A protein has these predicted regions:
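Small-residue hinge/turn detector
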Residues: 52-64
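Glycosyltransferase-associated regions of secretory-pathway enzymes
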Residues: 1-51, 67-168
Length: 168
């Protein structure tokens, strides 16, 4: 059921990480979380916005690695796996921009980590469909950055070790 590009990426995971188990979160799994934001995003077929929330719930509740399915792995990332907390990476958001932010397509977290919990709790207090009918299409890297800034994150392309989150 996956496009060729995704099949190639998933095959790279199995090749590079043969000791890992891949967990695919389904529509039914997302609905079972019981989060209004997820349910509203799903109801209007905005899958990526529902997935933004599911990824933080998954890593908070189960621990592990979150990767978008279009990530191709060349080598292992063991050195970035935190004993506790969350690890993610800086990224430049727009070509030519000096502003950088936090990567949401690939991050690692211990079960119960405070950072993923706080991001998930942010979404639990929000509606995807606003009272006026418009959609809250704020992408998760902005939410991550806002929460990380409260922990001391500065938008610079440099390694930062903060309370509960390491940014590389």
């Amino acid at each position: 059921p996956y496009p060729l590009e995704i099949k190639i990426c998933l095959a790279s995971w199995k090749r590079v990480l043969p000791d890992y188990t891949v967990r695919v979160w389904t529509y039914e799994d997302a609905k079972a979380i019981g989060c209004k934001y997820i349910d509203q995003a799903l109801s209007v077929r905005k899958w990526a916005f529902a997935a933004d929330v599911v990824r933080f719930y998954a890593v908070y509740k189960e621990g592990g690695v979150y990767m978008d399915s279009d990530i191709y792995l060349h080598k292992r990332f063991d050195r970035f796996i935190p004993e506790t907390g969350c690890a993610t990476f800086n990224e430049r958001w727009e070509e030519g921009e000096t502003e950088s932010g936090i990567q949401a397509a690939f991050f690692i977290g211990s079960k119960g980590n405070d950072f993923c919990k706080e991001v998930f709790e942010y979404y639990q207090t929000r509606d995807f469909i606003r009272p006026d009918g418009s959609l809250d299409q704020t992408v998760s890297p902005y939410i991550m950055r806002s929460i990380a800034e409260r922990r001391g994150y500065v938008c610079k392309e440099e390694e930062q070790h903060l309370k509960g989150i390491d940014v590389y």
